[in-house]
């Protein structure tokens, strides 16, 4: 039985072995068939590539597409509120160079030499070349002679100092440069220097970015270069731009400035601009309006793609996206008014300069109290240059410099008294010198007025009334020769109300670097509260003073000052101002925490200042047809400038006055203009320069209004 079982098992194994043998050849055949199909497909595809698509692929092998080249476009323009151009773009015929990838210094030199035959470089560009520039150029022109400047022994010394690789190359290069003599540099001809100036411009920027070689080329140069572009790889002729100011220096400091292509992007903001598709050498707004509205003014660059061969030669250029000039800004400023305001400032500074040597600046702000639009933002400053007196634009001083403003802030003091219930309308105090324990000098008005109420106090500018109001806010009744016990909380309380008018806080103007003024000493000295109440403690800017007066003029709404009125598209015709893209709506920053009847009561006091016989401003403003109201101011201070003329023999700052003025018109209807005048560091507090300037600028505003009553509007694109 065992033997039979073994025989059966042997037969089974033989059957299974036969089955396996029959399966293996079948699988091999399938595999060979698949391989055959794959090879057939590859052969067919190769045939297609060689026979059908061969020419196409040969062309693709011989060329490559480089990165997109961006070409800058003109910035947006700026117009005044009447549609007159303030900032324009002057077109300039320009020669540029775009360095392609793979182009070496020898190829650049060839192009520079060919270009030097066609254009003449400005002397200033050649004067900017450094000795290092010239030595490097000499080495490029005299490679064999330059190589002999450093011996193998020199290199061996460096290696002994364990200097190898790139560091060794750098040391060798520096030593070669150092050993070039002045005689060898003198071998460079005038033509060589001109070639070097061109080459330096060509190498100044970044690859694939057009670099300006020469701007404002002559018509002949532009023509001959354009004709020879085929033999000048990388060179192009185009029309560039530079900022142009039809009104010269008027408002220039506020308009801001634009960087040059050499300055390019600021290092501290490089990443910010690069992620926004700027090139490193792009021109951008550096300051104020140009900087604040960079995103609006910059525009969209034209982008094109250069198709090149293996050698880097451009076969053709394909435009990817069409460029678009920046959008335009319509400012709130009235340029005709601005000119007249600046003329007034300059005229008065010149007239008073001989008798007022410390008085070197003056400011005016005019704004619409209903919407916050700035109508004029003007400042002038006397500087000594080249041994003579010059007057420069200092409009920025209206928002970045601050001064004690004197009695112009008394309206805020009275209103703070009302709101804290320290006083009421028509509250009376007796105006006479006030004496306090520990003080040798009395606190008094410029004149003793006797029994007066709040309106009379504003009209004649009583200091004593304001002192009593401040004491009442502090919870103190005046007793002669008593000590003052005023806590810091009273300062905080008064500042709370002053700040509601914009005094001591940002005005919110759409420009950077605004000053909020300076607080007086923070230690708790009671007498300083009295100084604060008459504007002789904290400092404020001329713009803050104008916002304060606007807030009173419009019934208690603090409006955000705006210098840009609209953003407009580029028009199709130059005489148009473009369609409105965005209008800047008026912004109410806050409503003052004061009863409207209180504000109107103070406005009556301001009317009396300008219109009643013994008002401090009546001598200048009484009876004028445009019915102005406001407040004069005189602050005792010390010289705050840098000139030695403001210091005595012991180097102490001399005492002087800040003369100020603020107001609005008309007083008997909705006021349409509010203004401030600040003239710091005056010797003679009776000079009246503040009132003279104030009248001149108000006259100018209403004269222009009359002249324009029948004028035709500026055309707007449809």
Language-model features, listed with the residues they occupy:
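Solvent-exposed, polar/charged alpha-helical surfaces in well-ordered, non-transmembrane soluble domains
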Residues: 106-113, 117, 223, 227, ...
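Membrane-proximal periplasmic segments of bacterial cell-envelope enzymes
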Residues: 2-295, 300-315, 321, 470, ...
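Short, gly/Ser/Thr-rich active-site loops of penicillin-recognizing serine hydrolases
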Residues: 575, 692-718
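Short loop/turn motifs at secondary-structure junctions and domain boundaries
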Residues: 66-71, 353-360
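Conserved, well-ordered alpha-helix/loop/beta-strand core segments that scaffold catalytic motifs
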Residues: 210, 313-355, 362
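A short acidic/glycine-rich loop-to-helix N-cap element
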Residues: 681-691
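Beta-lactam-recognizing serine transpeptidase/beta-lactamase-like catalytic domain environment
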Residues: 87-88, 93, 307-322, 333, ...
